[in-house]
A protein has these predicted regions:
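Second-shell residues forming the walls of enzyme active-site clefts
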Residues: 48, 84, 92-109, 119-121, ...
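Bacterial Sec-dependent N-terminal signal peptides
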Residues: 1-26, 31
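Active-site mouth loops of central-metabolism enzymes
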Residues: 56-67, 133-146, 228-242, 304-312
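Preference for extracellular/luminal or secreted protein segments
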Residues: 25-59, 63-75, 288, 309-614
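Active-site-adjacent structural elements in enzyme catalytic domains
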Residues: 91-110, 140-158, 356, 361, ...
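Short acidic, glycine-rich surface-loop motifs adjacent to enzyme active sites
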Residues: 54, 73-91, 175, 250-273, ...
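Catalytic domains of carbohydrate-active enzymes, especially glycoside hydrolases
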Residues: 71-87, 150-164
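Short glycine-enriched loops at secondary-structure junctions
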Residues: 61-65, 113-122, 162-172, 212-218, ...
Length: 614
C-alpha cells in the first residue's frame, strides 16, 4: 500500500473519530454511560432521604416579593431542591437568581421553561417569538419544523435552560377547545405525531430536553384544566388511534420527558381518578404499555383541574402523583409541606426506597445528559453579559420570517376577468403586482392591545404590528416599475358599523381595498374576536367594491364566516405577530407565493392530509 494512501486512511479515520466524539458531546450519557452511571450512584450515596425527595420538585419563583422569595428559595436549596421553572418574569433577574441558587446548591438545579414558541412565551417583552404550533402545522416543508425546534432548543440552551416543556402533541380536533387550540399542530394525529417528533428532535439535537404533553391527550375537550377537570369520554380504540398516537411515536423517537395532563379518562382508569394521580394511566399505560423509560412530570399541580377537583389537601397531591408513577412534581402549592409528606411516606413504608431511588436516578441522569453534573460552580454560571442583545439573533429572525412566508393560507382567491387592468386574462384577484391598478387602499381594523414586544428600548403594542403590513406593502410597491397609489385608513378601538361604512364610502374610487383585521382573538368563547355584523357589512360591500380580507387570526374563522368567498380574496395569517404582517404583505403584493395549508378543518375546507408513513 503506498505511503501517501496509508497516511490518507489514517487521517480519514482520525477525522471521523473526532467528528464522532464531538457529535456525542451534547449527550453525555450516550457517550459515557458507565462513567455517568457511576457518577450518579456516587451522588446518590451521599444524599439524605430529604435531599432525594426534594430532587423530585420543580418550583416557580417570581420577583414580586423578593425577601420572601429569597427566604423560601434558600430553605428549599438547603433541602436539595431538584429544579425551577421560570415564567412570567424578567429575563435578567431570572437568570441572576438561578446563578445565585446554583451557587448554594449541592446538586445543580434543573432549569426548565414552558416555552412552546420559544422563550418569548414567558419573557414576552424581551425576546422575539416564533410562530405557534398550529401555524407550523400549516407548513408543508417538514425540514422547517425541525429547524424551528432546533432554533428554539439552541435559544433555550444559550439562556441556561436544560428542559423546555414542548412540544404540545395534543390533537386539536375540537374547535371549541379553550386552552390547546393554536398550541397544537392540528387535527390529524399522524401529522401531530410527525411534526411533534421533528420539533422534539430539533430541540434535543440543539442540547435542550423536550417534553411531550399533555398525556393522554387534551385536544378534544372544551374545558380548560387550569380552571376545571376536562373529561375524555372515548373508548380505548379511539384513544389509541387519535390521542395516544403522537405520544407513542415521540416515545419511539426518544423524547426525554412526558408531561401528564389533568384529565379524567375512564377508558384508561375506570375509577375516574385524575390522570396526573392515576396509577393505571401513568404506570400501566405510559410506562408499561407504551414503554416510556424517560422522565415523567406533571402539569402544574397548582392548576384547578387537580388542585381543586381532586378534593385532596394541597400537600397530599404531590404524594399521590408520585405514588402513581410520576418523577417530577411541577409547581405544587405547598412545597415544603409536600416534601415532608413524601419523606414521612417513605419512612412509614407507604413508598419504598427503591421507588424513590428510581425517580431520583432518572432525574440525575437527565441532569448528567444536559451537562450539569461534574462541573464547577463557575462553569454552571449562566453568562448574562449582553443577554438582551444576544437573544435577538439575526439567523432566528430570518428563520421566523421564512416560517411565516410558508405558513399563511390563501383560503380563497377568486378569478377576475378585467381586460385592460390585468397583465393576464382570467387572473386571480391577488397578487396585486399582476394588476395595473391606479389606486389601492389598505383599511386596517385595529383594536386595543397589550404590550407584546420591547426590543432595544422600543415598546410595541401587539395591535401596532399593522405597521409591518403597511410598511412592507409600501416598500414592495415603491420598488416596482409601475407603482400604484397606496393610501390607508385605520379604524381603532371600539369600531361601529357606521364607522366602517363611512370608511368604505370614502374608498369608492379605489381599484382594490385590502382589509386587514388585526384585532382577532384566540378565544372561541369570544367568537375569536369576530364581529359578525361588520363581516357581513364587508361582504355586502364586496359585491360592488373589490375587497380582499387578511384575517390575522385562527383558521377556525371559516366556521364563523361561511360567506368568506363573497370577498375577492381571503387570507388566513394565524396571528397579528409582526412576522405574519410582513408575510401577509409579501403574499398580497406577490413577492411570496402562498403555500400554507389548513391544519384543521373549518367551514367548507378540510384539514390538509398526506401519507406520513409513520
Amino acid at each position: 500500500m503506498p505511503l501517501r494512501f496509508l497516511l490518507f486512511v489514517v487521517l480519514l479515520l482520525s477525522t471521523l473519530s473526532t467528528m464522532k466524539a464531538n457529535a456525542a458531546q451534547p449527550n453525555e450519557i450516550a457517550a459515557q454511560p458507565n462513567e455517568i452511571a457511576a457518577k450518579v450512584d456516587s451522588i446518590m450515596r451521599r444524599m439524605s432521604l430529604q435531599e432525594r425527595v426534594a430532587q423530585l420538585f420543580v418550583v416557580h419563583f417570581v420577583s414580586k416579593h423578593p425577601r420572601r422569595v429569597k427566604e423560601l428559595q434558600n430553605r428549599l436549596i438547603k433541602r436539595g431542591l431538584g429544579g425551577v421553572i421560570l415564567m412570567d418574569d424578567k429575563l435578567l433577574p431570572s437568570l441572576e437568581r438561578i446563578n445565585a441558587m446554583n451557587a448554594l446548591a449541592k446538586i445543580p438545579l434543573l432549569v426548565t421553561l414552558d416555552g412552546e414558541w420559544g422563550a418569548q412565551m414567558r419573557y414576552w417583552t424581551e425576546i422575539p417569538a416564533f410562530p405557534k404550533q398550529m401555524q407550523l402545522g400549516s407548513i408543508k416543508d417538514r425540514k422547517m419544523i425541525y429547524r424551528a425546534g432546533y432554533a428554539i432548543g439552541k435559544e433555550c440552551k444559550d439562556l441556561g435552560f436544560q428542559v423546555n416543556y414542548a412540544p404540545d402533541v395534543d390533537v386539536n380536533n375540537n374547535p371549541d377547545n379553550p386552552v390547546i387550540h393554536y398550541r397544537s399542530f392540528g387535527e390529524d394525529p399522524q401529522k401531530v405525531a410527525l411534526y411533534g417528533a421533528l420539533f422534539m428532535q430539533g430541540m434535543q439535537d440543539a442540547g435542550t430536553s423536550a417534553c411531550a404533553k399533555h398525556f393522554p391527550g387534551h385536544g378534544d375537550t372544551d374545558v380548560d384544566s387550569h380552571k376545571s377537570l376536562p373529561v375524555l369520554p372515548f373508548d380505548i380504540k379511539r384513544l389509541e388511534e387519535v390521542e395516544l398516537l403522537p405520544f407513542k411515536y415521540l416515545i419511539e423517537k426518544g423524547v426525554d420527558l412526558v408531561m401528564l395532563g389533568h384529565l379524567q379518562v375512564k377508558a384508561m382508569d375506570s375509577t375516574g381518578t385524575i390522570s396526573s394521580l392515576s396509577y393505571p394511566i401513568i404506570t400501566d399505560w405510559l410506562k408499561n404499555k407504551l414503554g416510556f423509560e424517560g422522565v415523567i412530570c406533571t402539569d402544574a399541580l397548582e392548576m384547578k383541574g387537580v388542585a381543586v377537583e381532586s378534593g385532596l389537601p394541597q400537600s397530599r397531591i404531590p404524594l399521590e402523583a408520585f405514588k402513581a408513577g410520576v418523577d417530577i412534581l411541577l409547581m405544587p402549592n405547598e412545597v415544603e409541606a409536600s416534601i415532608k409528606q413524601i419523606v414521612h411516606a417513605v419512612r412509614r413504608g407507604e413508598i419504598s426506597k427503591e421507588r424513590l431511588n428510581e425517580s431520583v436516578r432518572k432525574i440525575l441522569m437527565l441532569k448528567a445528559k444536559r451537562g450539569l453534573l461534574g462541573r464547577g460552580k463557575e462553569e454552571l454560571r449562566i453568562d448574562t453579559t449582553g443577554i438582551n442583545k444576544r437573544v435577538i439573533r439575526p439567523e432566528n429572525l430570518a428563520l421566523i420570517d421564512s416560517l411565516a412566508n410558508q405558513s399563511l393560507i390563501m383560503a380563497w382567491n377568486s378569478r377576475r376577468n378585467q381586460l385592460g387592468k390585468s397583465t393576464m386574462i382570467n387572473q386571480r384577484a391577488l397578487p396585486l403586482k399582476h394588476w395595473r391598478y391606479g389606486k389601492v387602499a389598505y383599511l386596517g381594523y385595529v383594536g386595543e392591545g397589550r404590550i407584546v414586544q420591547k426590543l432595544e428600548g422600543s415598546v410595541k403594542s401587539n395591535v401596532e404590528n399593522f405597521e409591518h403590513f403597511y410598511n412592507t406593502l409600501k416598500e414592495l410597491n415603491n420598488g416596482s416599475q409601475s407603482p400604484f397609489q397606496l393610501d390607508s385608513i385605520l379604524l381603532r378601538g371600539t369600531i361601529t358599523a357606521e364607522m366602517l361604512s363611512s370608511a368604505l364610502d370614502s374608498l369608492q374610487g379605489y381599484d382594490c381595498i385590502i382589509v386587514g383585521i388585526h384585532n382577532a382573538l384566540n378565544s372561541p368563547a369570544k367568537n375569536f374576536g369576530i364581529n359578525d355584523e361588520h363581516m357581513r357589512l364587508l361582504a355586502r360591500r364586496a359585491r360592488t367594491q373589490n375587497i380582499s380580507v387578511v384575517w390575522f387570526g385562527t383558521p377556525y374563522v371559516l366556521n364563523k364566516v361561511p360567506f368568506y368567498k363573497d370577498f375577492a380574496s381571503f387570507i388566513i395569517a394565524h396571528s397579528n405577530a409582526d412576522f405574519n404582517n410582513r408575510a401577509a404583505a409579501r403574499i398580497v403584493y406577490g413577492e411570496v407565493e402562498p403555500c400554507g395549508v389548513m391544519p384543521v378543518s373549518a367551514g367548507d375546507q378540510k384539514a390538509y392530509k398526506e401519507d406520513y408513513n409513520l
